[in-house]
Each structure stands twice: as C-alpha cells, then as structure tokens.
C-alpha cells in the first residue's frame, strides 16, 4: 500500500505489519519507520498520512489506534481510536 504525505510529498510504502518505508517522490529511500512499541501496522486510514496500528493490549479501552505519520521526522503520533 502506498500513500503520499500531503505535507512533504514523500511517499509512504506499507509492507506487512512491521515495515513502513519512506521514499522521495522519485522513489529513493529516505528512511524506515518501525511501528510503535506494542503495535503492528495494519492499513492507511483517511486521505492523509495516517496509519491504523493494532495493539497487543488495550489502551483506554481500544486495541486499534490511528497514528499520524511525520514522514520528514520519521515519527508517529497516536491521535485517535480506530473504528
């Protein structure tokens, strides 16, 4: 699965549950981002750079959470439960 970060133009490539690759618009490798500790990647959500991650345990009553991707910094931020 692929998604273009609307802020940076970087390409996010999701391969399996543990591989998020960041590529330049020309396809050159920029960095890899690991899933947050205790989570695995599932799929992209919505139109932006947001991923659903599945948790090993519940947090605030939810296992699946949406994480916003900062492709330029190589970070993920938990933003909301995934429905």
Question: What does each model-found stretch correspond to?
Answer:
Residues 61-83:
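Acidic, proline/glycine-rich low-complexity IDRs
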Residues 1-7, 35-48, 81-83:
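Repeated scaffold domains used in trafficking and secretory/extracellular systems
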Residues 2-15, 47-60:
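Short beta-strand elements that form the blades of beta-propeller/WD-repeat-like
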Residues 17-23, 59-68:
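Structural motif
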Residues 22-37, 77-80:
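Aromatic (tryptophan-biased) beta-strands that constitute blades/sheets of beta-rich domains
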Residues 14-15, 36, 54, 70, ...:
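A structural detector for beta-sheet-dominated domains
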Residues 10-11, 40, 67:
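Residue-level detector of beta-strand structural context in well-folded domains
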